[in-house]
């Protein structure tokens, strides 16, 4: 229905490529089903999302028995809006609101702070770990 009602144009693209980082970089907003791409787009590119109202079966996951909701489901309403059959006709207004309302920018900032530990230190920490591991392994080899 969305693709039919909103055909591709110079301003709108329905991209289904496997390598999607270039289109994500160019986009102002993402309308998506439930997927990890939502967080790539929103947290890496600092842009809002509209996500589909989907049922999530957590029974295959290790934490299926937890009574608290997964972080993902508490973060989604802070970074964008849920698209349902009831509000589908308001999609244009939802897009405008997600782009313009500062609460979504604030929500993205909060989500980044909650997920990115040691921001800017990833390479340094990985190299330090690998060097430490190498040193440990070479010491064991030398002792034999």
Language model features: what each stretch is:
Residues 1-39, 44:
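Donor nucleotide-activated moiety binding/catalytic core segment of transferases
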Residues 3-7, 36-115:
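Catalytic binding pocket for nucleotide-activated donors in carbohydrate/polymer assembly enzymes
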Residues 26-29, 97, 132:
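Residues within well-ordered alpha-helical secondary structure of globular protein domains
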Residues 119-144:
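C-terminal alpha-helical cap of glycosyltransferases
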